[in-house]
Amino acid sequence: MLRLLSAVLLLAASGASAEQALGDAAARQLLTRTGFAPTAGEVAAFSPLTQRQAVERLLAGTLTVARTPAPAWIDDKIVLPRDLQRLPDDERRTYRQTLVRQSLELRGWWLREMVDTPVPLTERMTLFWHNHFVSAQPKVLWPQPLYRQNLLLREHALGSFATLLHAIVRDPALLIYLDGATNRRGQPNENLARELMELFTLGQGRYTETDVKEAARALTGHSIDPTTGAFVYRR
């Protein structure tokens, strides 16, 4: 993926010829496309660089882990839906309010990482994969799996797509969001298999219904430990 990204970044920096200094305009364009909103200091640092030097600097500092400390509740035990229904009304309402608060805190945690990171490219690519392998709080319910998915996307943000794909189909947040955790032998759920082919890899019209059914069969057993929220494989 890094070779492909290098080529893309060189195109993004094409406002200047290959051996000339980028200049402020091309540097700002490159940093905007590979990050969020570059500061004047960042633009000034890239302005005297050639295209190749700029790309090499961008790729040299990439990260695979977040620098912002995790939210304090990240290892709290999750309450399963069946257990939640057994709670008194006031406790159930309080727990749901807690989940909403934690989800907002999780968004704030990631926004802080985006703002403070010394490597905006890492967060830009993490955001790209977050939009590609979509999961959302209303269905996932718990913020802990979404936090761990964010870590996973960052770890592989600039690595092998094949490695990321193998990891993401075992990701608890995605398994919940696309019903992979309820895909059972004899009672297949094809949602994850269909999205895997149509949205994540091949594209519409490049697979058959038989492909979907066989992929769903191959993904049976991918499940979640109800006590920890971690991925488990059930035979």
Language-model segments: residues:
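Sec-dependent signal peptide recognition
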Residues: 1-7
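N-terminal signal peptide c-region/cleavage motif recognized by signal peptidases
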Residues: 13-15
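Boundary of Sec targeting at the N-terminus
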Residues: 19-20
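Mature N-terminal segment immediately following signal peptide/propeptide cleavage
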Residues: 23-43
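Short alpha-helix boundary/capping elements
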Residues: 35, 63, 133, 137, ...
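N-terminal accessory alpha/beta regions
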Residues: 40-156
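Active-site substrate-binding loop specific to GH73 endo-beta-N-acetylglucosaminidase modules
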Residues: 91, 103-110, 142-235
